[in-house]
Amino acid sequence: MSLSNKLSIRDLNVKDKRVLIRVDFNVPLDGTTITNNQRIVAALPTIKYALEQKAKTVVLMSHLGRPDGKKVDKYSLAPVAKEVERLLGKKVTFLEDCVGEGVENYVKNACDGEVILLENLRFHAEEEGSSKGPDGKKVKADLEKVKEFRRSLTALGDVYINDAFGTAHRAHSSMVGVELPQKAAGFLVKKELEYFAKALESPERPFLAILGGAKVSDKIQLIDNLIAKVDSLIICGGMAFTFKKTLENVKIGNSLFDADGAKTVGEVMEKAKKHDVEVVLPVDYITADKFAKDAQVGYATDQEGIPDGWMGLDCGEKSVELYKQTIAKAKTILWNGPAGVFEFDNFAKGTKATLDCAVEAAQSGKIVIIGGGDTATVAAKYGVEDKLSHVSTGGGASLELLEGKDLPGVSALSSK
């Protein structure tokens, strides 16, 4: 799966065509109030472009929450339609279903330039391919009904645009089942693919990956895929303790230790040696007597280790200095996973200092990519998203891409 050769919306002529766009409007709601509209704002450039290029109609489809294949009022996209209308400054027609004769007829006879938002795709089991039965167990959707669902979605457009990167790792009907001749990436997906291609297909070297997070076993595929591509690797966050204890027998007290992950540490280091990859680990720690915001704060280095009853929740200044030096040498930096428990202020300094270095690197012209999930939350928390080259919008999708997996939603797009 090449990331750099997919059709994008700019490659298409959408004039007088019905443009069917899979967006990600999975926004947090408090009742019917949207508490964060960022995902809607992110989709606006693609929607506006289709309208500027004189598309006949723009049909938007999305999921919201996990209604498990049935209609659940609190997951209706009706409040989202009002917000899209407000942001676009243009009327948005909300339809109470996403497939079926009524929807098909409405779209067929829509006014020129009309924007239509369909109801939640996941109200139908055919979107995800399964639903939950009364006993909470998965029930597979009927294959014929899935085919009909996909046919009905396909009938709503002349061209298909995917701008929902966060769902690209799911082989859902709206991601892979629309059978139109031209299927292209919207601006959001295009940017994701461009930046991940810069890292994974043709990085400017030296290439550094910063990998944090809790468990080695959760990140092992990621480490495995990247170790053959990078020049240096910083391993930080909770999973560093498994490396420190296994490799150097550092006393880690009650810090996180991943027994399963420990079995793979030797293998990782062997691969690093084989590919001539410099591996950087923390050397000092900010410690806590419990996993809590109000924990007592301590400090430990590799020499004395972390005492029993205490746990490392962040890295210390010496570690940050090592990270800084490694970041300074790199030209492409990919970061996935925080350096400490940034949710607690007393244990956020290591992550914040690493972020400051990453911002400085990006501002000096280096490519800095934040790989979604918690690290994207960190960038948002400190308001620096626009100071980095790219902050991915896909948690699971970016992780799978970095693990070397094909994303069904990307594979389904037409190639140039």
Curated annotation (Swiss-Prot):
Disulfide topology: none
Protein name, as recorded: Phosphoglycerate kinase
InterPro entries assigned to the protein according to its UniProt record, in alphabetical order: Phosphoglycerate_kinase (IPR001576), Phosphoglycerate_kinase_CS (IPR015911), Phosphoglycerate_kinase_N (IPR015824), Phosphoglycerate_kinase_sf (IPR036043)
CDD domains referenced in this protein's UniProt entry, alphabetically: Phosphoglycerate_kinase
GO molecular function term, any single one: phosphoglycerate kinase activity
Function: Catalyzes one of the two ATP producing reactions in the glycolytic pathway via the reversible conversion of 1,3-diphosphoglycerate to 3-phosphoglycerate. Both L- and D- forms of purine and pyrimidine nucleotides can be used as substrates, but the activity is much lower on pyrimidines. Negatively regulates the biosynthesis of acetyl-CoA from pyruvate in the mitochondrion.
EC number assigned by the record: 2.7.2.3
Subcellular location: Cytoplasm; Mitochondrion
CC terms in the record's Gene Ontology section: cytosol; mitochondrion
Residues the entry annotates as binding ATP: 214, 219, 238, 312, 343, 374-375
Catalytic activity: (2R)-3-phosphoglycerate + ATP = (2R)-3-phospho-glyceroyl phosphate + ADP
Pathway assigned in UniProt: Carbohydrate degradation; glycolysis; pyruvate from D-glyceraldehyde 3-phosphate: step 2/5
Cofactors, names only: Mg(2+)
Example GO BP: glycolytic process
Annotated Mg(2+) binding sites: 214, 218, 374
Sites where the protein binds ADP: 213, 237, 342
Record: residues binding (2R)-3-phosphoglycerate: 23-26, 38-39, 62-63, 65-66, 121-122, 169-170
Gene: PGK
Organism: Funneliformis mosseae (Endomycorrhizal fungus)
Binding site for AMP: 214-215, 219, 238, 312, 343
Entry's family note: Belongs to the phosphoglycerate kinase family.
Highest taxon listed in the record's lineage: Eukaryota
UniProt subunit comment: Monomer.
Keyword terms, alphabetized: ATP-binding, Cytoplasm, Glycolysis, Kinase, Magnesium, Metal-binding, Mitochondrion, Nucleotide-binding, Transferase
Residues where CDP binds: 213, 218, 237, 337, 339, 342
